[in-house]
Amino acid sequence: MLYDAIKKLVQYGINTGITPESERIYTTNLLLDLFHEDNYEDVDCDLNNLVLEDILAELLDIAAERGIIENSIGYRDLFDTKLMNTLMPRPSQIQQTFWEKYKVSPETATDYYYKLSQDSDYIRRYRIARDRKWTVDTEYGTLDITINLSKPEKDPKAIAAAGKAKSSSYPKCQLCMENEGYAGRLDHPARENHRIIPITIQDNPWGFQYSPYVYYNEHCIVFNGQHVPMKIDRNAFEKLFDFIKLFPHYFLGSNADLPIVGGSILSHDHFQGGNYTFAMAKAPIIEHFTVKGYEDVTAGIVKWPLSVIRLQSKEVKPLIDLAEHILNTWRSYTDEDAFIFAETDGTPHNTITPIARKRGDLYELDLTLRNNITTEEHPLGVYHPHAKLHHIKKENIGLIEVMGLAVLPARLKGEMELLKDYILTGKDIRSNEQIAKHADWVDEFLPNYSSITEDNVEEILQQEVGKVFCEVLEDAGVYKCDEKGLEAFHRFVGVL
């Protein structure tokens, strides 16, 4: 019943604080208009225990029945964002509240904004809850594993319709300021319920927002107000620490700026951060070293599957000075014995994935050494997950994975369910096209378990997936965690 569902949605807005009580009638009228409805009756309905997902589902069903939208996930997602926007304050009101709360403390401001980003359904809590998450203990610490199920699968109708639609270059990408309030298209998400907090980084306008897919607590994105490409240089380090000074309870890192070792969006300058301590941040330094001329910065090699130098200092400037020196040295560094080539045929290979944070009184910067060289044996990258691990993960190892969180493809959920059944019943895994790619891996680990039962098979699979992710990270490390690898790492440190 339309009136019933509208009343519930408005009440949800009031309960969460995104809609003031004084705007009840105004908001009701905005919603009626979206349903082409001239009438309204204030009906009696149960306003206790309101569940947003259920209210929206009812309203979307009504919109589809009335022919206002096509009944497919793409169109439903565009329309429910429109519905939520009717409950929302204007951007300037949210910005004003944010900075008022910031005067109390940076945490108070981000707590408010994170809750708002969820209450507005920009972060769809009920979808995030579907993600599968677990942890795996390794020699490097406890790694986080997630199978990402919150990104909606594209439905075939929407793909076909998007193919026929006129192509648009507005907004230029999903990280542009122009997304705020944008109604979206089948090939570009609706962002009408999205609100960005403008901040100043290096005297330039930047935006601060949360990721709608929240891979970890308070997963935020900090992005340039201009659509300019990613670049790792001194300026990038300065930008990271400008943000850390604003929000010292958050870390902030950047993807590398080269293909294969970079993230999925290299075309728009941006960083990712949040209020979470990854395994990498907990990893100890295995040996300290001092770089001549930079004696006031503590430096060391981190015990981590990727090759990481950690810098610490009470002051930001000396930290950035040394980071720039390490970056420039690494960019031009070749060590043939360790298969590190700065460039081949004029194509550069060496770059860095940096992560900045504040630890007590110290500013800290982790510099992850990356190289994107390819060979015939490893066409996707020598320091990239090798082919035998592609059944679990073949995508780029970006910032989030570097820090110790696996973001694994949604296909794995169904494949793991099938594998459980095949392992328990002793069926031939190779006979099923969907899971045949996992057969060698299962053959490898099965002998390590004396008994696999319905009670422990899921836990065993989760642990084995975690071990594969650990191997993935080791593949991405330019210096392996063995005697030979450490010797080669020492050679690089020696030239600093």
Label every model-predicted segment:
Residues 206-211, 236, 240-244, 290-297:
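Structured alpha-helical segments in the cores of large, soluble enzyme domains
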Residues 259-267, 345-351:
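Beta-rich nucleic-acid/ligand-interaction surfaces
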Residues 244, 248-264, 273-325, 331-334:
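Catalytic or ion-translocation cores adjacent to nucleophile or general acid/base/metal-coordination motifs
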